[in-house]
């Protein structure tokens, strides 16, 4: 199992660096381009959600990122310093916010949201 874990500032360059490092590990484990794309999309959506909505782009606020990569699955977990997500307000695809979470929910095998922590689990089939 590979574990990629990092606490980063709410900064686009830090986010890009973490995402690139995580994707390199993911690509080494899985050669299925569709699966890798799905994981990239999940990673991007969850971290950008923390950047934009959770931490409101405030640089000093932290984003905790954890990616667990195993032969059978990948888990992406993100925690920010925001107030949390009201998942019930994310059901409308035409709403101003919530499309990213709805997308992640649709392509994940399991999505768990608890206040300001969100985790997506995807099994490799």
Predicted regions and their residues:
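Conserved beta-strand-loop-beta-strand hairpin that lines the nucleotide-binding pocket
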Residues: 1-4, 51-125
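STAS-typified acidic loop motif
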Residues: 5-16
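Residues in soluble alpha-helical coiled-coils and helical-bundle/repeat scaffolds
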Residues: 13, 30-31, 112
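Short, structured helix-loop boundary elements
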Residues: 15-16, 36, 40, 60, ...
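Conserved short strand/loop->alpha-helix "switch" segment adjacent to the catalytic nucleotide/phosphoryl-transfer site
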Residues: 20-44
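Conserved polar catalytic motif of the HATPase_c/GHKL fold
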Residues: 45-49
